[in-house]
Structure formats: C-alpha cells, structure tokens
Amino acid sequence: MRRPGAASARPPLAVLLHGIGADETDLFALAPALDPRLLVVSARAPFEAEPMGYAWYAIDWYEHPPRPDVAQARASLERLLAFVGEAVEAYDADPSQVLLAGFSQGASMAVSAALARPEAFLGVAAHSGRLLHALLPASPPHGGPRVPVLWQHGRLDPVVPMAFGDEARRLLPPLGVDLDFREYAIGHEIGAESLRDLATWLSGRLGGAGA
C-alpha cells in the first residue's frame, strides 16, 4: 500500500490488478509514477497459477482463442468487488473516487467490474486485456452513469492480440462505457509511453493538478 504524498482525510483510491502468473508486487512497481494524491493498493488474484504466481481465472490454452474458466472469473469478480469495498473502509478512502487499473487478466477483471457496478468507479484503466463475454451485461444500460474506461493495447502483442482490443473498441461504448482507446507499437507489456498516458489519465479523473 502506498499512502498519498500529503495527508488527506479521505484520499482517492487506486486498486491495481496484475496479470496471470504474477502477484500483487508486480504492478505495485508502477506506484511511484502515479499521482501522489492517490492511495494505491495492489490486489492478489485468488487462484494459484502454474507454474508460478496467481490468476484471476484459469485459461485453456489448447482452445483457439484460449478459453477462460468462466466460473473462476465470476468468483474473482465477486471477490474483487468485495475487496474494493473492504479497502475503502479499511483505509478510509473516498468511495466516490475509486479507480481500477489492470494489466492482461487484471485488465479483463477491471473492465468486468466497471460493467457490473459502474456507479462504484470514477474510472477504469485496462492495459493489454480482453473482454470476458460471459461477464458482459445482457443488454445495454438504460440511463445511469457512463463509466470512463481507458483501454490501452500493443499492436505487436503476441499474447492478447490487437484483435481483442479492436473488439473492445467496438463493443464497449454501446454498453455504457465512455471509452478512451489508445494503441502503441509495443508487445504484451506496459511501455514508457503507455505508462505516462495511464498516469495522466488517472490524474485527469481526479481533476486539478497533481500534487
């Protein structure tokens, strides 16, 4: 957990979600690049991955495209939403200023959370992810808030190909998402440019200038 640079009664909260085979320490390395007003926490996925780390859901790599374990994804989504609420309470964060940022599987979970509970998030950033079709809303929302989503994807990504990003660009706006889509000449990674864009976008959701 990284506390805000200056004392704040109820700081905004950013929750970071790692990809498969990693753990909560992976994305926490990005914390120094993020707005100092943010209280930053990094969540660990609930399932053990092979050969190392943790996963939000298992993947059948023998399918084409690789098929996610939907039951595990649903269970992880419930755990994630509960974790966010617990973190807000535990750290006395501002419940109206909660941001999610995820990479790969973490990106898929972040967007799934935004679609499941759009009123709970000030914004969601997804880097190198894919949509989990089984977790998409059955129908477009009628009224209510449009959740801001930053989707970042590498055109050279060999793990989660750009086609998944293009699909998200097509499907998310009709589902009540205010989408900011950006692509980069990188692979399955967070590059220097995409990290700067992520940090700037998160700061913009808070409003005003970073401390």
Task: Please give the residue ranges for each predicted region.
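Alpha/beta-hydrolase-fold catalytic nucleophile elbow
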Residues: 44, 101, 125-128, 152, ...
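Serine-hydrolase catalytic machinery in alpha/beta-hydrolase-like enzymes
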Residues: 1-93, 97
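Short beta-strand/loop motif that positions the catalytic acidic residue
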Residues: 151-153, 157
